[in-house]
Amino acid sequence: MSGPVAITAASLRRAAEIVRGGGVVAFPTETYYGLAVDPFQPAALERLFAVKRRPADLPILVLVSGPEQLGLLAAGVPSLFTPLMRSFWPGPLTLVCPARADLPTRLTGNTGTVGVRRSPLAAANQLIAACGGPLTATSANLSGQPPAVTAAEAFALFGDSVDLVLDGGATPGGQGSTLVGVRAGRLCCLREGVVPFAAVQACVFSCADPSPFS
């Protein structure tokens, strides 16, 4: 690979071919550059973990085009997430749902859950559309190191260990997405990021009884 390529109809088609063939594509998201593989291909996930030097017990987040794709990944969607999807999607809020039993264990990290979000960034959604389904969205970094915020940084980090770097300009960096889950029927914050957990609580509080909070 000679370097990052601009996002065009042709490069998106090429990226989709790579992903469908089990390859790895770096692409921009609303926070950092991410690494996309087909989340349903175990071999592609193995390669993703090798590229990132990622510990095997850490799950991988997934981007979807909208709630209609949740059934491909989640065994069920907690009712507490309904107002959150309406208020914060598309946006940097990852919802951790019970995972379908047939998902690769590399994706879930044997947690029994899967984290999903819908990106507001056009380039990310164009890639999902070109690939025809959800994509992994783990940050473009070596495990434990800062993520890439530009295509040039992603290329410098990975070079030929990824198959394509899509250049969508600089990403904001800073905090990652906020992760929320439900435990014993109660909303919980697994990682606070761009979206304040207080705003998440307020959203659900305005639609339901306050008891679901922890």
Regions found by a protein language model. Give the residues of each.
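Active-site-adjacent structural elements in enzyme catalytic cores
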Residues: 1-214
